[in-house]
Amino acid sequence: MDIKQLIGETTDYDKKVALETKKPKSWCKSISAFANCYGGRLVFGVANDDALVGLSDAEGDAEKISEIIKTHLNPIPEFELSFEKDKDKTFVIVEVMKGQQTPYYYEGDGQPVSYTHL
């Protein structure tokens, strides 16, 4: 998969410039929404203006992403992590499948919340 093609042609994705571990709600709500609707992809290393910035520790970030999803979402959605390279930059792509056990809740602020995409 070409990262430029993914961010340029699809609407079933969200992007984050970096992994936020202290405030995972900012991206876990996208994981919840994808699992509760039609599935989708969350791309780490892409800025809001679609600039390709990459991640400095993509493998370490991927491990943290997996751990955070497993500890903050209930039930745990089906997802796959992959890496994409563009020149000297590396990106982490979280592909979330359409859930079979909806609703999927984000549990991180004391009260479970379910999200959807419109």
Where are these regions (language model features)?
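Conserved N-terminal catalytic/coupling substructures associated with nucleotide/phosphate chemistry
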Residues: 1-118
